[in-house]
Amino acid sequence: MALIDFFPNGFTAQPQQEELIDRIDDAFNTGYDFVICCAPTGSGKSFLSKTLSNHSKEASSNFTRLIESYNAFRVDQFGAYSRAEECENEPAFGAFALTITKSLQDQYTNLFNDATSLKGKNNYICKVDPNYNVDFAPCHFNNKLKESCILNSTCDYYCARRDTLTNKFGVLNYSMFLSLPEHVKKREYIICDEASELETELVKRFSRNLNYKILKRLGYRPSDIPVENYTKFRVWLGELIFKIGNEVEDLKKVLSKKRKNASTADTDVQRFRLYTNLLAQIKTTTDNWEDCEYVIESNLESITLKPLRVNNLSKHIFKFGKKILLMSATIIDHANFAKILGIKKYKYIEVDSTFDPKNAPIYVVKDFKLNHKNLKEKLPTLKDNILKICNFHKNVKGVIHTHTMEITQYLKDNIDDPRFLFRIDGAVNEQIIQRHIESKEPTILVSPSMTYGVDLKEDLARFQIIAKASFMPLGDERIKKLFKEDPDWYANQMLNHLIQACGRGVRTKNDKCVTYILDGTITDSVIRNAKKLPKYFLKRFN
């Protein structure tokens, strides 16, 4: 049977989806293990993931038993998973769809009833003690309690883990996937959704911040740490792991004795949580030290470690899939994209948008240009331009992509209008989006971080404003190094974010949303890089 025959039941494949699925099928059947797919917003990329999962096999009965019985997670006296080899010997099955946000996970599970989703432990409340999330539940100090909760399906987190690891279609964010034990992750298909952000996700996962205040508690002064010597710093990290490990073991003994009387405010509880997380993070860094060149930065407050490149880190995702599909609405310069991720042989597939560009026009300015040096001076003019547009669209909802917290804060301080919903003062995107959805007023979302995973369809956004080019900060040593090596990489990052932002308000074929770009720097960059930008995107410019 052809891959298209496994299109989800209850849905009808659109011509564009049929084309994509047929081309993916052909690529996988002609020797390609990697397919890079560039398909615009509204092309139904989620259905590609579900079609692949439908095409895959079910989990073997033995693998299912190993997961459901908890045997897959039992460790021996040395701390190694005792049944890891048995799990790894089971055949690959099913598909994992990996996303960048929890809201994108929710979109999958809302669309497909048989999809299962697993999120981090802090998203689940402990059923034994509701005062805690699962990431610090009583079972951390009581293995018998933990096993009881798992085997009796008491804990929502462990139920979600069980179901997601045995289901044909599991949906996880990249962070969750990377934190799972290796022996339970083998699949027929790994689908990397929003793959244009995969480099960022890998850098985030393998970066570390070591705060001097914490290091001081462990007996280290800044002068004791060899940040200028790469080899000696690696040796020092090994010493740090040993010291933190001893602290964790000592705290376990203390907390196991006073668990009933401990609270989240308890100093020992806080230290345990801090050191446990720090230990896991540093171990991840040292385990991958040889695979990537780390950029080490030090300031008065902390030491930051970031991998310069991710071409050798992508294996922590790719090695678990027999076939890999990477898909995004914004694959800019696919050859460079593949090189960054260490992909040598792949099939590139791109389809045009079926949306009418007249329904989603983009208007730009040319002479008003923002940069780090002139931003403060030009903020008043930027605010005035934003207000003019918002007043013109006074009866409809919209969104303002600010790019920086500085711009967001300035607008909040200088606009006294309840119509504007700011992501500031501890607010998160999910909170202001919910208010936006529930309000009958023509509210406007104002946030620096709604580029991805936000579905503002129909009346939720009839206009949107891009306030500033989202160039990455050159004060970051990693970014500065890569910029010097490859200026095109730097420009591509900004253009990728731009295209994603411009797609937040146009979600269906008949949807309408006008976009205003207020930074002439963006206009210049689009003109310079027009040849490598998607045609459907360029058609929107007026």
Question: What is each PLM-predicted segment?
Answer:
Residues 3-7, 57-170, 178, 224, ...:
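A substrate-engagement module of RecA-like helicase motors
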Residues 30-52:
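Walker A/P-loop
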